[in-house]
From Swiss-Prot:
Enzyme class of the recorded protein, top EC level: lyase
Gene: dapAL
Protein name (database record): Uncharacterized DapA-like lyase Tneu_1812
GO cellular component, one term: cytoplasm
Compartment list: Cytoplasm
Keyword Flavoprotein tagged: no
Catalytic residues identified in the record: 44 (charge relay system), 107 (charge relay system), 133 (proton donor), 162 (schiff-base intermediate with substrate)
Protein's UniProt keywords contain Acyltransferase: no
Documented EC number(s): 4.-.-.-
Any Pfam family hit: DHDPS
Family: Belongs to the DapA family.
An MF annotation (GO) of this entry: 2-dehydro-3-deoxy-phosphogluconate aldolase activity
Assembly behavior: Homotetramer.
Amino acid sequence: MRIEGVVVATVTPFAKDGVNYEGLRALLSKIVEEGYQGVFPTSSTGEVTKLTFEERVKAMEVAKEVAGGRALVVAGTGTGDHLSTIEIARRYRDVGVDVLLITPPYYIQYDWAAVYAFYKRVLDKVDMPVVLYTIPLATGYNIPVEVFELVANEYSQVVGVKDSSGDFRYHLDLIHLLGKRLSVLQGLDLLFVPSLLMGAHGGVLAGPNFLGRITLEQYRLVKEGKTAEAVALHNKLMPLWRFMGGCGLVGKLGGKWPTLYKVATQMVRGIDMGPPREPLPPIDDRDRKELEKLLKDLGLI
């Protein structure tokens, strides 16, 4: 399996009593209709670590109903140990998801041997297409490219690597060492066009929650060799990414980035996103006004 194009890491709409599944269904429907290659509800942007296993499975059931046969349905584990990872993977498999994205172990800064052992324990029990993942913001460490190479050499179900490190030298190593065998996928909107230009196969990105077809247009321009136009569109979005979060997903407002994506999605799509799930904080009026101005400058609202 080769994953190419844009998989959208969707935000999770909440109601007072839990996940707003109808809101999620509406969002997924719009994204699929726009032509994106995949959807990924149980993502970091989707606040996966704050969802119960039941909520995660239900979200993936909705995604399968909406996108099945029209776009890849990708499920994220959001777990930090091998037993929970295997359990949620089996439940996702029963739903019929297309690809499993495995969150690396977090909370403790593990060495490469521990991470390698984690992958072996999981992949010995999980037989479905898998994307490996590095996200130092959440784990406190970056996974050596050589670990991904070892795992991919041993397990044929590994089909890709998602890189949310923000380290472009590291990303180039992934492309150089693994790009002929695996799909190398950029995890940060800010680096999507530069990654494509250097040979990445696509991205797993949150921007399309509210950008409409803009991210697809970036992908098309690069694939058609229209580099100057792709770079111009990339630069047009830079003020937004500087505000919302760029390399490392921190940006101006620190840990509020998932909330920003939800607020932007509600502004553009008109779908009630509800509040972020605690302890994620809301944004204040000043930040809301700045976000609104940036979206207006782009003609999105």
